[in-house]
């Protein structure tokens, strides 16, 4: 276990004003298990320091309903939560009458253009401001009420990579969804985008009083009062992780001329194909998860001739699709095996393949025919597929694709 000192935690709580701001007494909702350092930061440490109101969900299954009831002003969620909100909205829009669909698409284009101007530090012209106002009154306000985000001042996502397109979608709606970065060994947050400085596709700048640099191997290193004291009972691992005060995060990335940090992938997850091509699987996986029908994905291909993928389907949305198309099935496994569902996922994968170079495209895929929950060993507490566990458990399924 990682040993965190009282000083580590106090630093995070007192330093948060530099990247959150303290203009209001926030009301938040706590969804993730408190064993997760980011959730403990947002639901315990920061509320104690800033006197926020904390609401706890009744259960993971009621999290979206509880969010609608509370309508938090500040909200931290993992990418899967934001992906699910997006996919639920897309499905509902697709089921709406033609006039509703047209209004949504038009409003989204206007909102996206408006957000691009704002994020670039520009000033939208009068016509665009007027269009954005109409879009807010006719479309966006209702969507935000439906999502429980109508009072949201600031939203954060972290704990896993997120698609830039997903953040852009929320920005188009007028919601400040900001990506941040940290880990248990840093007692919480190391970098963050802010309302004043936000660059989509990055994890923001180093927060106040924290230093960031990239070593000769491309690994992100950080230094500051938030760095932990070491791993309990494991001085060897501690010595490998913290050298001369610098924490070796295990993430590969870059820092641009303005100080914004961009993560490529986990060092251990980089795929090197049989042809010697280095590929970041998370970039492909993020694009796949932007589909309303794909809950998660694991790209395979290390030391192999081509890339394949294991897909975890979004049960609710795929179930609705099957019912609307009158596709017969008996259980989750039979639903996953239906040719119509395989074709549906195949189309989504081809749409993603079109965005990447040929060597980075998915050549074959298989659907995991089990409905996984946080209690299963394949998933983390934040609903991420554990790559090594999945590759080991489904090794025969992977082998069948080569």
Language-model segment annotations:
Residues 1-13:
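Conserved AMP-binding A3 loop
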Residues 278, 292-296, 317-368:
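Conserved C-terminal helical docking segment of ANL/AMP-forming enzymes
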Residues 197-200, 227-250, 285, 325-336:
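Conserved ANL (AMP-binding/adenylate-forming) active-site segment centered on the GW(Y/F)…HTG consensus within
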Residues 10-27, 34-140:
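Conserved AMP-binding/adenylation subdomain of ANL enzymes
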Residues 206-273, 290:
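Conserved ATP-binding/catalytic segment of the ANL
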Residues 55, 128-133, 145-157, 162-218, ...:
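Conserved ATP-binding loop and adjacent catalytic segment of the adenylate-forming AMP-binding
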Residues 252, 257, 291-317:
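C-terminal boundary motif of the adenylate-forming
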